[in-house]
Design a protein with these regions (language model features):
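A short, N-terminal "cap"/entry segment at the start of jelly-roll beta-barrel domains
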Residues: 1-35
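Extracellular/periplasmic catalytic domains that process cell-envelope and extracellular macromolecules
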Residues: 19-20, 32-34, 53, 77, ...
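Residues that flank catalytic or metal-binding motifs in active/ligand-binding sites
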Residues: 24, 55-58, 63, 90, ...
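Conserved hydrophobic/aromatic beta-strand scaffold that supports enzyme active sites
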Residues: 25-27, 38-42, 59, 75, ...
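Conserved short histidine dyad/triad with adjacent acidic residue
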Residues: 29, 34-53, 87-91
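Short acidic-glycine-tyrosine-enriched beta hairpin
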Residues: 32-33, 67, 71-91
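Glycine- and acidic-residue-biased ligand/ion/polar-headgroup-sensing regions
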Residues: 44-47, 54-73
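Ligand-binding loop in jelly-roll beta-barrel domains
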Residues: 88-108
């Protein structure tokens, strides 16, 4: 599937693959190594990604649970239905809610 195609993706029936302990992803389109890409990502309850940055801008919409975000400006709980844009190169910490984790759509 290319970016020019009509794409329908259902997170309830998507096939997720473990990326690292506490994180699993389901690619919708693109290439996660070469970019750009989009997919569903799950953070296990209490997952801690630590401080990091991304090469490109990351756009995400939380679908279930809560994505925990923190940078020098403070901490934000990004809940179901919320949108977050993280600029490429911006150092931040992220994680999943301690009880529910997080399910979100992510695009670069």
């Amino acid at each position: 599937m290319g970016r020019g195609a009509v794409i329908f993706a259902d997170s309830r029936t998507a096939s997720f693959k473990a990326l690292m302990p506490g994180v699993s992803t389901s690619l919708i389109w693109g290439d996660t190594v070469k970019g750009p890409y989009a997919g569903f990502t799950k953070f296990a309850p209490g997952f801690d990604a630590g401080m990091h940055s991304h090469t490109n801008d990351v756009l995400l919409v939380v679908m279930n649970g809560a994505y925990l975000y923190k940078d020098d400006a403070g901490e934000k709980r990004v809940g179901a239905g919320d949108f977050l844009r993280i600029p490429g190169g911006h150092k931040h910490w992220s994680g999943g809610d301690a009880k529910e984790g997080a399910l979100f759509y992510q695009e670069t």
